C-alpha cells in the first residue's frame, strides 16, 4: 500500500514553514481534495471542480490551556504552500461522512461560527479510508483532550473508528542511552509520540467489560454482527414474556381499578367541599379588597385634602391685600416723603396683577370666583391709584411753571441776559420719575394726558425764556446797519461796507449756544421722564461744539441723568424703529412749538443789520445741525433745518436784489470804461470770504455763480448797445474783473473758474479790437492779400498776376499807397488805440499785442507776395519790425 501523506516529513516541514512565527506546532498534515457539495450554474463549473489542498492540525499552548486550529493550505503559483483558511476547533460542532460517496472517503466539517450557514461547507476527499480515519481520529482525540468534548459524528460508527485506531496504531522503535552509553531499543506506540492528542476513544475498563460480555456469549471480539443478531432475538423474547405477565395479572388489575374508583369518589367529594370553601374564600377576598379600596380612597382623600388646604392657603395669601398698601393706593399722599411707600405699593400691585395672570397662575385657579373677584378688586385699586396720580402730576407740572413765572428775576431783563436754568425743575421732576415708570406699567394710556400737561406747561416757560432772551440780546447788541444792497451806485454804501458787524453773528451764535443744548436736554429729559422707548441720546448739543460743552458744564448739569434707568432694564433696549418714536416727535412738537419764532426774529434782525452775516449764521447753524443725531432731538433738527432754510432764503433774496442792481445798468445811457459793479463785486466777494464758517462754502459759491453769470450777461448786453465800442468796453471790464479778483481766484475754485472765463473773453475782445484798428489803417494792403488767398483755392500762384486787379502794376500801386509814410500810419494806429481807451494802464499791453498782430499779418503778406510775385521787391519784415520798435 502507498505511503500516507500524513507520514510525509517534507509536507510537515512545508506546513511549519507556512505558519512560521505563529508559535504553533504542526500535529498532522495530510493532502486532500476540496470540492463543493452542490453544483452551481454551468458557467461556474470551474468553481465546483476538486482542488488540491493540505489540511494541517496545529496546537498552541496558552498557559494551562491549549488552542487547536485546523488550517487549510493551498499551493501558490510557485508550488509553495501558503495559508488559505483557518478554523478554530473549539467551534467544530459536526463531523459528517458523505453517504453518497461509495468509497466513504469524503466528509464535511461543520463549524457553528460560520457567518453564512446557508452555504454548503466544503467537502474533503481523502485518498483512502485509512487516511480519512487517521485524520478524523486525530481531530476527535484533540477535541476530547483539549476541549473536553466531542463533536457530533454522522455517517460513521464511532466504535469502528475506535477499533480501527487500535489496530492501526504503529509501534515506533526509539533508542535511548544507558548510563554506560550503550543504546537500548524501546517500543513506543505512535499515539504516545503524538503528545496529548492520540488518546483512545474507548477506555481500557470499558474494553474489558465488553470482552467479558462477549465471552458470556462465546463470541469473539471480531464477531460484532453475530453479537448484534443475538441481542435482537433476546430483546424480542423479553418483550413477549412481559406481555404474558401482564395477561396473568388481570385480577390484580381489577382490584386496583376498584380501589382507584373509590379513591376517585373521595376525591370528587373533596373537590366539592373545596369548591364551597373556594367560593367562601373568594367572597372574603372580594370583601377584603373592597375594604382596602375604600381605605385607599380615604387615605388619598386625606392627602388631597391636606394638599388642597396648603394650596388654598397659598392662594389666599396671594389674594390678600396688605392694609398699608391699600391705604397708599386709595388715599395716600404724593408728597416727596411718602413717595417711597407709594413706589412700594405700586410694585406690590404690579406684582399681584401679574401673579393673577394665566402664565403665572394655574389655569384652573383663573376661573375661580374668588380669583376673579380679587382681580376685579386689584383692577379697581389700579384705576383709583392711576387716576389720583395723574391728577396730582398734572397739577404739579403746572405749579412748577407757575412758580417760575412768578419770579421775574428768572428771565432776562434790561441790561442783563439771563441763561435759563432748569436744574431745579428737573430735580423736582426726578422725585416722580419712578412713579412715572410704574404708571406706565400699570396703565400705559394714562401717559398721554400727562405728556400733554407737561408739554403745555413747559412750552409756556421755554417760549417766555426764549422771547425775553432774544429781546434783550437784540437790545444789547450795538452795531451800525450795513446796506442790504451792495452793488448800488451810491457812495454811502461803500463807506459803510467796512463796518464791523461781527456782533450780529456772535449774538445769533450765542442764542444757539444757550438754547440748542437746552432744547436737546429738555427733549432728552422729556423722552426719559415720560418713558418713551427710544435709543439713548448723544451728549447735549452734539460733538464739535466746544463753547456749547463749556456752557453745559458751567450749569453744573450732569446731562440729565434721571436715575431711573434701572427700574426696567427692558426699556433700555428698544429698536431703532421704536413705535414710540412717532409719539415722541408729536409730543416734542407740543413741547417746543412756538419757540422757533424767537429764533426767526434774531435771524431777521441780523439780516437787516448786515445781509452778509447770513453766511456766518448759515455756517453756525449747519455746525449745530450736524451734531444732532439722537432720535429725541428730532424737533431740534427740524428747528435748525428751518433756521438754515430761512437764512438761505434771506441770503438768496439779498443775492437777487444785488443781481437786480447789476441788471439795472443795462438800461443806462452809453457807458464807457470799467462798470462800477465789477470793483464792487470784488469788494463784496472779499467780505463774503471773511464771513464763511463751516459748511457755508456751498452757499457762497452758489451766490458767486449767480453774481458772475448776471454780471457777464449784463456786460455783454451793454456792449451790444454800441457795437462800435463794444470790444473796448468788454476788454476793459474783463481786464478789471481779472485785476480785482486775482487774489481771490487763487484761493476760491469757483472764482478761479470765472477768472479763466474772463481771461478768455478778454483775449477775444482784444483780438477783435486790434484787428479792426489794423484793417482800418492798412485796408488796401490786407484787402489785396485777401484777394490773393481767395484765388489760390482755385488757380495756381503763377496765374494770379494775370488776373484782373491783381497784376504787378496793381501791386506796386497798392504798396506805394499803403507803405509810403508807414510811420504816420502806425502812429495813427497808436492814437486810435489810445483815443477810446479809458483804462490807460491797459495801453502798453494792447499796443504790444497790436504790433505783434500787425507784424504777423505783414509777414504772411510778404511770404505770399514772394510766392506769387517773385520778382517784385517788398519792404522786409525786419525793416518793419525796426520801424515799430523805434516808435
Curated annotation (Swiss-Prot):
What InterPro entries does the database record attribute to this sequence?
Sec3-PIP2_bind, Sec3_C, Sec3_CC
Write out the coiled-coil annotation as residue ranges.
221-250, 278-315
Q: What highest taxon heads this organism's lineage?
A: Eukaryota
Pfam families documented for this protein? Sec3-PIP2_bind (PF15277), Sec3_C-term (PF20654), Sec3_CC (PF09763)
Biological process terms in GO annotation = acceptance of pollen; exocytosis
Carries keyword Coiled coil?
Answer: yes
Q: What does this protein do, in the record's words?
A: Component of the exocyst complex involved in the docking of exocytic vesicles with fusion sites on the plasma membrane during regulated or polarized secretion. Involved in polarized cell growth and organ morphogenesis. During cytokinesis, involved in cell plate initiation, cell plate maturation and formation of new primary cell wall.
**Hey, which family's this protein in?**
Belongs to the SEC3 family.
On subunit structure and binding partners, the annotation says: The exocyst complex is composed of SEC3, SEC5, SEC6, SEC8, SEC10, EXO70A1 and EXO84B.
Q: What is this protein called?
A: Exocyst complex component SEC3B
Where does this protein come from, organism-wise? Arabidopsis thaliana (Mouse-ear cress)
* Taxonomic classification: Eukaryota, Viridiplantae, Streptophyta, Embryophyta, Tracheophyta
Amino acid at each position: 500500500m502507498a505511503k500516507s501523506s500524513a507520514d510525509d516529513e517534507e509536507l510537515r516541514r512545508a506546513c511549519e514553514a507556512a505558519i512560521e512565527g505563529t508559535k504553533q506546532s504542526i500535529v498532522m498534515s495530510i493532502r486532500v481534495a476540496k470540492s463543493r457539495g452542490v453544483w452551481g450554474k454551468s458557467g461556474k463549473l470551474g468553481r465546483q471542480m476538486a482542488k488540491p489542498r493540505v489540511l494541517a492540525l496545529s496546537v498552541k499552548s496558552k498557559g494551562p490551556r491549549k488552542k487547536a486550529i485546523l488550517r487549510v493550505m493551498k499551493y501558490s503559483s510557485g508550488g509553495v504552500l501558503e495559508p488559505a483558511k483557518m478554523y478554530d476547533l473549539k467551534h467544530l460542532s459536526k463531523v459528517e461522512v458523505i453517504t453518497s460517496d461509495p468509497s466513504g472517503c469524503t466528509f464535511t466539517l461543520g463549524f457553528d461560527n460560520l457567518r453564512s450557514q446557508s452555504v454548503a461547507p466544503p467537502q474533503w476527499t481523502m485518498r483512502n479510508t485509512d487516511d480519512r480515519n487517521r485524520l478524523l481520529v486525530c481531530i476527535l482525540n484533540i477535541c476530547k483532550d483539549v476541549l473536553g468534548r466531542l463533536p457530533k459524528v454522522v455517517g460513521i460508527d464511532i466504535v469502528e473508528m475506535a477499533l480501527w485506531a487500535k489496530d492501526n496504531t504503529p509501534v515506533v522503535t526509539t533508542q535511548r542511552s544507558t548510563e554506560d552509553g550503550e543504546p537500548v531499543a524501546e517500543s513506543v506506540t505512535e499515539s504516545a509520540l503524538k503528545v496529548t492528542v492520540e488518546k483512545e476513544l474507548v477506555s481500557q475498563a470499558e474494553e474489558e467489560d465488553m470482552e467479558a460480555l462477549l465471552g458470556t456469549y462465546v463470541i469473539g471480539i471480531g464477531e460484532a454482527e453475530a453479537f448484534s443478531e443475538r441481542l435482537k432475538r433476546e430483546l424480542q423474547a423479553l418483550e413477549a414474556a412481559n406481555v404474558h405477565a401482564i395477561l396473568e395479572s388481570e385480577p390484580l388489575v381489577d382490584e386496583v381499578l376498584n380501589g382507584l374508583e373509590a379513591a376517585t369518589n373521595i376525591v370528587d367529594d373533596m373537590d366539592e367541599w373545596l369548591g364551597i370553601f373556594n367560593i367562601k374564600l373568594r367572597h372574603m377576598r372580594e370583601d377584603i379588597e373592597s375594604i382596602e379600596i375604600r381605605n385607599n380612597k380615604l387615605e388619598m382623600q386625606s392627602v388631597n385634602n391636606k394638599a388642597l388646604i396648603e394650596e388654598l392657603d397659598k392662594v389666599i395669601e396671594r389674594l390678600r391685600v396688605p392694609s398699608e398698601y391699600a391705604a397708599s393706593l386709595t388715599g395716600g399722599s404724593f408728597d416727596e416723603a411718602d413717595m417711597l411707600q407709594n413706589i412700594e405699593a405700586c410694585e406690590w400691585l404690579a406684582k399681584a396683577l401679574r401673579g393673577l395672570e394665566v402664565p403665572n397662575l394655574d389655569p384652573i385657579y383663573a376661573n375661580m370666583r374668588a380669583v376673579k373677584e380679587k382681580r376685579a378688586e386689584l383692577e379697581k385699586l389700579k384705576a383709583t391709584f392711576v387716576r389720583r396720580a395723574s391728577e396730582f402730576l398734572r397739577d404739579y407740572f403746572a405749579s412748577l411753571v407757575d412758580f417760575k413765572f412768578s419770579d421775574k428775576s428768572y428771565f432776562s431783563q434790561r441790561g442783563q441776559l439771563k441763561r435759563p436754568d432748569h436744574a431745579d425743575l428737573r430735580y423736582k421732576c426726578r422725585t416722580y420719575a419712578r412713579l412715572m415708570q410704574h404708571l406706565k406699567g400699570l396703565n400705559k394710556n394714562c401717559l398721554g394726558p400727562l405728556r400733554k400737561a407737561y408739554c403745555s406747561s413747559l412750552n409756556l416757560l421755554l417760549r417766555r425764556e426764549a422771547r425775553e432772551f432774544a429781546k434783550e440780546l437784540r437790545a444789547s447788541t450795538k452795531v451800525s446797519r450795513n446796506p442790504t444792497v451792495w452793488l448800488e451806485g451810491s457812495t454811502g454804501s461803500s463807506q459803510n461796507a467796512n463796518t464791523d458787524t461781527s456782533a450780529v453773528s456772535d449774538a445769533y451764535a450765542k442764542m444757539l449756544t444757550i438754547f440748542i443744548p437746552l432744547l436737546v436736554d429738555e427733549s432728552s429729559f422729556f423722552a426719559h421722564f415720560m418713558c418713551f422707548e427710544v435709543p439713548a441720546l448723544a451728549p447735549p448739543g452734539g460733538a464739535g461744539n466746544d463753547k456749547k460743552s463749556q456752557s453745559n458744564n458751567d450749569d453744573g448739569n450732569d446731562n440729565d441723568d434721571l436715575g431711573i434707568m434701572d427700574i426696567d432694564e427692558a426699556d433700555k433696549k428698544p429698536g431703532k424703529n421704536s413705535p414710540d418714536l412717532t409719539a415722541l416727535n408729536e409730543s416734542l412738537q407740543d413741547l417746543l412749538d412756538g419757540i422757533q419764532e424767537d429764533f426767526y426774529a434774531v435771524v431777521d434782525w441780523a439780516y437787516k443789520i448786515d445781509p452778509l452775516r447770513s453766511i456766518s449764521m448759515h455756517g453756525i447753524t449747519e455746525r449745530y445741525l450736524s451734531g444732532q443725531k439722537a432720535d429725541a432731538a428730532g424737533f431740534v433738527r427740524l428747528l435748525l433745518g428751518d433756521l438754515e432754510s430761512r437764512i438761505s432764503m434771506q441770503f438768496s433774496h439779498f443775492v437777487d436784489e444785488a443781481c437786480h442792481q447789476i441788471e439795472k445798468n443795462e438800461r443806462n445811457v452809453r457807458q464807457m470804461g470799467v462798470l462800477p459793479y465789477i470793483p464792487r463785486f470784488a469788494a463784496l466777494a472779499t467780505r463774503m470770504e471773511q464771513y464763511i464758517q463751516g459748511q457755508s462754502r456751498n452757499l457762497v459759491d452758489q451766490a458767486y455763480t449767480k453774481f458772475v453769470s448776471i454780471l457777464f450777461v449784463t456786460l455783454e448786453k451793454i456792449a451790444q448797445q454800441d457795437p462800435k465800442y463794444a470790444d473796448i468796453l468788454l476788454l476793459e471790464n474783463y481786464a478789471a474783473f481779472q485785476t480785482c479778483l486775482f487774489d481771490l481766484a487763487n484761493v476760491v475754485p469757483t472764482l478761479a473758474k470765472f477768472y479763466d472765463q474772463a481771461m478768455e473773453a478778454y483775449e477775444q475782445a482784444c483780438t477783435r479790437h486790434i484787428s479792426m484798428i489794423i484793417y482800418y489803417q492798412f485796408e488796401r494792403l490786407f484787402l489785396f492779400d485777401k484777394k490773393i488767398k481767395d484765388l489760390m483755392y482755385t488757380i495756381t500762384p503763377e496765374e494770379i498776376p494775370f488776373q484782373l486787379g491783381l497784376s504787378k502794376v496793381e501791386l506796386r500801386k497798392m504798396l506805394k499807397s499803403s507803405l509810403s509814410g508807414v510811420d504816420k500810419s502806425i502812429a495813427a494806429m497808436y492814437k486810435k488805440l489810445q483815443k477810446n481807451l479809458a483804462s490807460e494802464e491797459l495801453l502798453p499791453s494792447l499796443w504790444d499785442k497790436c504790433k505783434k498782430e500787425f507784424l504777423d499779418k505783414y509777414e504772411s503778406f510778404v511770404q505770399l507776395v514772394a510766392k506769387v510775385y517773385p520778382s517784385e521787391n517788398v519792404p522786409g519784415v525786419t525793416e518793419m519790425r525796426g520801424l515799430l520798435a523805434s516808435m
